[in-house]
Regions:
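Bacterial N-terminal signal peptides
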Residues: 8-20
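Short, compositionally biased P/S/T/A/G/V-rich stretches that sit at domain boundaries
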Residues: 25-60
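Short edge beta-strand/loop segments characteristic of extracellular beta-sandwich folds
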Residues: 63-70
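Exposed aromatic-hydrophobic patches
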Residues: 66, 101-109
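Extracellular Ig-like/FN3 beta-sandwich strand-entry sites
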Residues: 75, 114-116
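Conserved aromatic beta-strand anchor motif in extracellular beta-sandwich/beta-rich domains
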Residues: 80-84, 121
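Solvent-exposed serine/threonine-rich low-complexity stretches and specific carbohydrate-binding patches
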Residues: 89-99
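Short, exposed beta-strand-loop hairpins at the edges of beta-sheets
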Residues: 96, 109-111, 118-136
């Protein structure tokens, strides 16, 4: 009987340790990192966004969705999904690596498409963790 109880306690303890040390799955509340900044800009220079805005001229050829993440718990991939008038126009997968701070970006050629645009940050399951709206006039 003592062996049986010890075995059950040992298995229970091992499962508890494994479950509490397993990497957290993505959720709306916790993507596995902190989003410090997610902005749309006209350029990225020296890993920093330049010309950040919500409105861009139709003459603007390309914009960037810049992401700064912090406290990344594990290596992962995220996607920046670009929408124009609620129609998906592009999906760019980007790596994010375990780190205190990570900066990355995706660019999108606007090809003169005026109207409402949106860039979404999605995890590998397609869950949206952040979005930025902007207008091309």
């Amino acid at each position: 009987m003592k062996i049986h109880i010890s075995l059950v306690l040992g298995i229970t303890t091992a499962l508890f340790v494994l479950m509490n040390n397993a990497p957290a799955a993505f959720s709306m509340d916790d993507p596995g990192f902190t989003i410090k900044r997610m902005v749309i800009s006209k350029d990225v220079v020296d890993r920093e966004p330049v010309g950040v805005g919500d409105f861009f001229s139709a003459a603007t050829e390309k914009v960037y969705c810049f992401l700064e993440a912090a406290d990344i718990e594990t290596d992962m991939q995220v996607s920046i999904v670009w929408y124009w008038s609620n129609q998906e126009m592009a999906r760019v997968t980007l790596p994010i690596q375990t780190s205190r701070r990570w900066r990355t970006y995706s660019s999108k050629k606007l090809v003169g498409l005026k109207g409402n645009w949106r860039a979404e940050l999605q995890d590998s399951s397609g869950i949206v963790h952040n979005s930025v709206n902007f207008v091309v006039e």
